[in-house]
Amino acid sequence: MKIANTFIKRGAAGGLDLSQAPGVTLTLAERRRSRQRLDLDEGRGELGMAIERGQTLRDGDVLVAEDGTYVVVRAALEDVARVTAATPWQLARAAYHLGNRHVLLEIAERHLQFEYDAVLIDMLAQLGGVTATRLRAVFEPDVGAYGGGHRHGHDESFGDDYALAQAAYHAHEHTPMRTPMPADTATFIPVMATAASTASMTPSLDAGQLAALLHLSSPALPIGGFSYSQGLEAAIELGLVHDEASTLAWIESQLVTVMARAEAPLWCLLFEAWRAGDDAAAHGWNQWFHASRETRELRQETEQMGRSLARLAQELGWGTAATRAAVAALRPATLPAVHACACAMWALPREAGLGAYVFSWLENQVAAAIKGVPLGQMAGQRMLERLRAGLPAVLADARARAGATPPRLDTFAPQYALVSARHETQFSRLFRS
């Protein structure tokens, strides 16, 4: 089998005689790989490709085999969304928001194109001023400043060359992503609850309700929570988390800037909607949460866990048939939506359900750190003790945000999104992406 070690860009191939040259039709994913076996079009044989890693082939580029023969690259038609707008400003605005979602984007003079994603289509519809059309077309996203050059072994170019990945990925230190976190950036003061606040936050549960809450919070619940690190594994890889102190700072930061400001108050809104029988409001907040997940990894995580919990509720017959049907109609079901519904089904107090939801998240984060950093079991228990002490203040903040008019939901967490995006293509992982 012939091997192509180099290629000629389409702009420089104008003087070549390609009239008899075979072609090879490749998807974008295939054009981004550096090492693979290619089946030529029309059954004209096969070609091995081993070009410099980090390159993206484009329609019209020409692969050069070791014997000097040429093979023309043809881009395959793919399922894409094409975005058009009445004004350049509206198109630029759409590009900005898509860029915030780390979307591979093809930018033309009068339109944008990206791999079709129904969630992104919904986001654009909410922005307004643009039209998104689904079609089959060649997809050549702009590689910008990231095309070629040095890579870190996180991308699919290394999919079939483990030794090369190890050499590129583990033979050097990664440059820190940012400066170290200031000592007071991600800490909160543990609040000792007064007798009055304790009564409002921890309403009494009968034995059946307590058992139901423990069941829903159990690590043995088969919804896959232990499989995810929510960016923590990437933070470890980047050197942001490396010992007990930095782990505690990271989890505290996520607790007070991500969980307390968005996911926890949203859980409260979902719980109140389910308890009031307002399926439309519950579905609306479910969609809002799904659209707020900034990376594919985070969207797929909440989809998988929500779907698994919904299936469990269906098979065990939780709640009424009407409520189970309303949960089944969620498209897609997210974890906070289904968890809040389960608490409402069992008539659990809101404060108890919210506390269980947030503590389960904390417990999963600590368990992920014990495996990934790694840390000892006592270190994990010390962190849980510290985090648990500050939980009342976090829950109070979440309830206040949910009770405001309109609700004060804040999803601004750029580092969290960037670290999650890095984890999607991290070469070596313990946790799901």
UniProtKB/Swiss-Prot annotation:
- List the molecular function annotations (GO) for this entry: catalytic activity; nickel cation binding; unfolded protein binding
Give the UniProt subcellular location, in the record's own words. Answer: Cytoplasm
Domain of life where this protein originates: Bacteria
* Biological-process GO terms, alphabetical: protein folding; protein-containing complex assembly; urea metabolic process
SMART domains xrefs: UreE_N (SM00988)
Q: GO cellular component annotations, sorted alphabetically?
A: cytoplasm
- Provide this UniProt record's keywords sorted from A to Z: Chaperone, Cytoplasm, Multifunctional enzyme, Nickel, Nickel insertion
Quick one: where's region Urease accessory protein UreF? 200-433
Which stretches of sequence are listed as region Urease accessory protein UreE? 1-200
Pfam families linked: UreE_C (PF05194), UreE_N (PF02814), UreF (PF01730)
Q: Which CDD domains match?
A: UreE
Query: Mind telling me which InterPro entries this protein's record contains?
Result: UreE, UreE_C_dom, UreE_N, UreE_N_sf, UreF, UreF_sf
HAMAP family on file: UreE, UreF
Q: How does it assemble?
A: UreD, UreF and UreG form a complex that acts as a GTP-hydrolysis-dependent molecular chaperone, activating the urease apoprotein by helping to assemble the nickel containing metallocenter of UreC. The UreE protein probably delivers the nickel.
By sequence similarity, the record places it as follows: In the N-terminal section; belongs to the UreE family.
Functionally, this protein is described as follows:
Involved in urease metallocenter assembly. Binds nickel. Probably functions as a nickel donor during metallocenter assembly. Required for maturation of urease via the functional incorporation of the urease nickel metallocenter.
Q: What is this protein called?
A: Bifunctional urease accessory protein UreEF
Give the originating organism: Bordetella bronchiseptica (Alcaligenes bronchisepticus)
